[in-house]
Structure formats: C-alpha cells, structure tokens
Amino acid sequence: MDLNNLTYKINGCAMKVHNTLGNGFQEVIYQRCLAIELERAGLGYAREQEHIIYYDGIDVGTRRADFVVEEAVIVELKALINLEDVHLAQAKNYVIAYDKPLGLLINFGSTSLQFKKIYNPKYRQNQDLQDFGINKINANKDSISKSNKSHNPVNPDSDK
C-alpha cells in the first residue's frame, strides 16, 4: 500500500474515533480506540514502540511513539485544545529517530479533528514524495538513534 493510501486509512480511523467520542477524553482513551479501528481496517501496527536514543554513540534514554503503522508511519496522538510547536517538534523527532518516511500528528482535543503530516527529509524515498493536500511539515532536526525491536503485539490480521 502506498503512503498516500495508508495515511488516508489512518486518518479515516481517527475520524471515526473522533466522530464517535468527540473531544474531552484523555489521550490514552483515544489511543485504545484508534487501536481498535486500525485493527478493523486491517492495518498492522505496534503500539508504544520503544527506541533507544544515542548521543555521540552513548545510550541516553528511550522514546516511545504512540503507533508505528505498517512499519512506515509514525502516529503521535494528542488530546489538547491547541497544538503547540513543542508537539510538532516531538513528532518531527520521532519521524527522524525511528527512520520512517513520514509521521502523522493527530489531535483529538479540539472540536474538529486536527492532523499534520510530517515528512522525513533524511529518508531516501521522500525526495520524490509529493504533498497530498495535508499540512506537509519537513522534519529537519539532526538526531541519532537506533531502533530496539518492539515486543508489543502487531496486528495478527496484517498481511505483513
């Protein structure tokens, strides 16, 4: 599945959750509901996949993205009235640290669902990607990280 179709499906799942619940719940509630919708859509995902962050070759800690969908898209969820630059920076860092082609920052906290698409300019195929009409943000922060394989369950219905 190409990235355009994949992000379209993910956003559709998020819209269904937001249309059903509305705003006002804690982020973890939206995360659990989105996991249900991703499974129903037949999308493979890992939840809260951990990565080790290195600084100058030294392990300095770990980070966890809310979802890695189909091993290609980082999905970071928020449940805030307004997104701020710090949330966008966090999503940018995840896209680069996890070495994925793109990420989605999805906010369930406002009356209308908000999402931003974030491309990783360091990912080789992104040089040819086009903006699909969703807010395109280029991640450009230098970051060094290595992946730790997640032991979280991946959707067994996935064709991967």
Which residues fall in each region the model found?
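Conserved catalytic cores of phosphodiester-cleaving nucleases, focusing on short active-site segments
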Residues: 22, 45, 67-83, 94
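A short acidic/basic microdomain associated with nuclease active sites
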Residues: 41-57
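Nucleic-acid nuclease catalytic cores
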Residues: 78-127, 133, 147
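A short, glycine/Asx- and small/polar-enriched loop/turn
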Residues: 59-64
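Solvent-exposed, charged helical/coil patches
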Residues: 1-42, 113, 119-124, 129, ...
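Intrinsic disorder/low-complexity segments
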Residues: 1-2, 56, 68, 121-160
